[in-house]
From Swiss-Prot:
Gene encoding the protein: ABCG3
Modification type Phosphoserine: residues: 93
Gene3D superfamilies, per the entry: P-loop containing nucleotide triphosphate hydrolases
Keywords, in A-Z order: ATP-binding, Membrane, Nucleotide-binding, Phosphoprotein, Transmembrane, Transmembrane helix, Transport
Polar residues compositional bias, start-end: 72-91
InterPro entries, sorted: AAA+_ATPase (IPR003593), ABC2_TM (IPR013525), ABC_transporter-like_ATP-bd (IPR003439), P-loop_NTPase (IPR027417), Plant_ABCG (IPR052215)
UniProt organism field: Arabidopsis thaliana (Mouse-ear cress)
Any one GO molecular function term: ATP binding
Name the record gives this protein: ABC transporter G family member 3
Region (Disordered): 1-100
Record has Transmembrane helix as a keyword: yes
Biased composition (Low complexity): 1-28
Span of domain ABC transporter: 114-356
Transmembrane annotation, as ranges: 465-485, 495-515, 532-552, 575-595, 600-620, 689-709
């Protein structure tokens, strides 16, 4: 208590300033809040040699004599010599590592101000747009500052963030106004960045490669300019030590940790040098050390002039001290907006002062999270050494109403409205698009990136090639030495059927890699870094070398081990036919994966489809003998196995002659009629190849429709929703 007493000039007891509900708080607890206007004392990290004792630079908005708004450097204070002041109620903040530390020079502001007034967001419920997720929210954010939207789960944090960024889903409707630099103009491409809670990274690329390809996809201009932007993003997010490290690692090296991956996701948006950066849960799944490092890095980014707005569930005391302003939400209602220290005073005035040894964010969530009521009910007979289990002895719903009413009648709410009026009374600089890379450039970048990823993904590509070789060797040894007699026709037909069917079925092993590509596309498309056509064309061109390598290696082994006709032109047709078969199969897998977006359901569906196509391919029963409904129409005609096998058999038997006895002979077409139905036309095999080519493009056209118009959202969304319901019921 001696240390607390020594800080009496900066702190006062909440019992002397709180409103009447303070009586509900046990007297055995001591609560202290900072006096308004007192300076923030940063913590020193004496045990960390990487952080120097630098002054804490606080960027805040002040009114000048001329009535304008300006960003001024606040008074800097020396670093506290110890961590003990954290326990005395001081909102501690670690020093921000900057290039010009200690010089007191404020960097040029390149951000943009954003303000929102009476912002309400509704979602489609039982009645159209009946569920209000965000209710009449007001707030603002300045360049060079960090504004955090805090609240419990399902409080409307992410919805408010998406509304500010203009990224609400079609099922949501927004009311109210959002101003950027004083005007209601839409933020163009490249003027802002948005980082999702969970982003998909490419594990087989290094950090520098990943950011460089992202810059090539996003930015126009010359290569050397993009390299400079990438290096700036790496420096800004403190990724220099990991720049040449694979994101996902490999057999002999671990990949990046969750905190480092999160910083890479943010760095990807920084290559556009946005004025405003929106981040959904930057501390998601991060431990305390990674969380603190993340926030210090973001603080450094804010000091460069960028406007940061992000959501957060809870934070430690050190992290909380880094925030400039806080928007506290509960059930869509704004319980407070203002500076972080003023939020502590607000809770104290409402009768819920923060205990000395408790993190402010934990205290806020305890007071406004209704889930704690169930825990208190379960533990109502439990008491700690000081008496009560909880410091807030009030029903959460009552606490929320008290905090909301206190805020609406406070000077903080009036100051927010006054600042919004001041920010919107005149229009500032309009944000302009910085341009984007052309479609041809994006296709070339995605193609080259796909080739690089395939060359490094041994688990999904090279292992798949090995499996194809093992399968082909197995089939080749099983059907070796057949000869060219009439008696070997049935066995040769079976060998071709087994080769095409089983090789296509084995291609399902590539589903995980395709799902990763779809997730990467969705992540890039959400920020307009890529498009459906560009993605499909780049993926198609990038997969051609790998699929052709598999087709030529497997075809050569099978062709010579089984002993098919010794003719180079026939061999080339065999290779091309099987290559087209793999292209169709890849398109089918991409189509199914795009529908489900789940490994289990995609694999199950593909296996079922392949089995049906194999049954209708004409080997187990000739196509003319198949039942007309279902099996002939449509299965026999939509099965790509049918056209591939038919073309390969026409390639093998048309023009061939078999001797029957010593004087009689029959054509290859006549010899195969009892085993498989083919056409006697010598050009029929090329028609079958054209059908395969059309199917390869047809499946990708269906994928384009799904990606472009989002027709798969309802199917996959319902599946995931039912899956979550089943898990919750368990």
């Amino acid at each position: 208590m001696e240390e607390i007493q020594s800080q009496s000039d900066l702190y006062r007891s909440s019992s002397s300033s709180a409103s009447s509900p303070t009586s509900r708080v046990p007297s055995s607890h001591f609560f202290y809040v900072r006096k308004p206007g007192s300076l923030r004392q940063p913590i020193s990290f004496e045990d960390s040699p990487e952080w120097e004792d630098t002054p804490d630079v606080d960027l805040r908005m002040e009114d000048e004599a001329g009535g304008g708004d300006s960003i001024n450097d606040a008074t800097t204070t020396p670093v506290s010599p110890s961590l003990s002041k954290m326990n005395s109620g001081s909102m501690a903040s670690p020093p921000v590592p900057e290039g010009g530390a200690g010089t007191g020079v404020v960097r040029k502001i390149a951000g943009a101000s954003i303000a929102w007034k009476d912002l309400t967001v509704t979602m489609k419920g039982k009645r159209k747009y009946s569920d209000k997720v965000v209710k009449s929210s007001n707030g603002y954010a300045f360049p060079g500052t960090m504004t955090v939207i805090m609240g419990p789960a399902k409080s409307g944090k992410s919805t408010l963030l998406r509304a500010l960024a203009g990224r609400l889903p079609p099922s949501a409707k927004m009311y109210g106004e959002v101003f950027v630099n004083g005007s209601k103009s839409h933020m163009p491409y490249g003027s802002y960045g948005f980082v999702e809670r969970e982003t998909q990274l490419i594990g087989s690329l290094t950090v520098r490669e990943f950011l460089y390809y992202s810059a090539l996809l996003q930015l126009p201009g010359f290569l050397f300019q993009k390299r400079s932007v990438v290096e700036d993003a790496i420096q800004a997010m403190s990724l220099s030590d990991y720049a040449n490290k694979l994101i996902g690692g490999h057999c002999y090296m671990k990949g990046l940790r969750s905190g480092e991956r999160r910083r890479v996701s943010i760095a990807r948006e920084l290559v556009m040098r946005p004025h405003i950066l929106f981040i959904d849960e930057p501390l998601y799944h991060l431990d305390s050390v990674s969380a603190l490092l993340m926030m210090v890095t973001l603080k450094k980014l804010a000091s460069m002039g960028c406007t940061l707005v992000f959501t957060i569930y809870q934070s430690s005391t050190e992290v909380f001290g880094l925030f400039d302003r806080i928007c506290l939400l509960s059930n869509g209602n704004t319980l407070f907006f203002g500076e972080t220290l003023a939020c502590l005073q607000h809770f104290s005035n409402a009768g819920f002062p923060c205990p000395i040894m408790q993190s402010p964010s934990d205290h806020f969530l305890r007071a406004i999270n209704t889930d704690f009521d169930r825990i208190i009910a379960m533990c109502k007979n439990w008491q700690d050494d000081n008496g009560d289990f909880s410091a807030v002895n009030m029903d959460t719903a009552v606490a929320i109403r008290t905090l909301e009413a206190t805020y609406k009648s406070s000077a903080d709410a009036d100051s927010v409205e006054a600042m919004i009026i001041k920010l919107t009374e005149r229009e500032g600089t309009q944000l302009k698009s910085k341009g984007k890379a052309g479609a041809a450039t994006r296709v070339a970048v995605l193609t080259w990136r796909s080739l690089l990823v395939m060359s490094r993904e041994w688990k999904y590509y090279w292992l798949r090639l090995i499996l194809y070789m093992i399968l082909t060797l197995s089939i080749g040894t099983l059907y070796s030495g057949l000869g060219h007699s009439l008696s070997s026709v049935a066995t040769r037909v079976a060998a071709v059927f087994v080769f095409v069917s089983f090789a296509s079925l084995l291609g399902i092993a590539g589903i995980p890699s395709l799902l990763k590509e779809i997730k990467i596309y969705r992540s890039e498309a959400s920020n307009q870094h890529s498009g459906a056509f560009v993605f499909l064309l780049g993926q198609f061109l990038g997969s051609i070398p790998f699929l052709f390598l598999m087709s030529i290696s497997s075809s050569l082994v099978f062709y010579f081990m089984v002993g098919l006709r010794d003719d180079f032109s026939l061999l080339m047709y065999f290779v091309l036919n099987f290559f087209m078969c793999l292209l169709v199969n890849e398109g089918l897998m991409l189509f199914i994966a795009c529908i489900w977006r789940d490994v289990y359901w995609s694999t199950l569906t593909l296996i079922s489809v392949h089995v049906i196509m194999m049954l209708a391919a004409g080997h187990f029963r000739i196509r003319t003998a198949l039942p007309k409904p279902v099996w002939t129409y449509p299965f026999a005609y939509i099965s790509f196995h049918t056209y591939s096998i038919e073309g390969l058999l026409e390639n093998e038997y048309l023009g061939e002659v078999f001797a029957v006895g010593e004087v009689r002979s029959i054509s290859g077409y006549q010899a195969i009629q009892g085993n498989y139905q083919i056409s006697p036309d010598t050009n029929a095999k090329w028609r079958n190849m054209l059908v395969l080519l059309a199917m390869a493009f047809g499946y990708r056209l269906l994928v384009y429709v799904l990606l472009r118009f989002g027709l798969n959202k309802n199917v996959s969304g319902r599946l995931l929703l039912s899956h979550k319901k089943n898990n919750s019921s368990r």
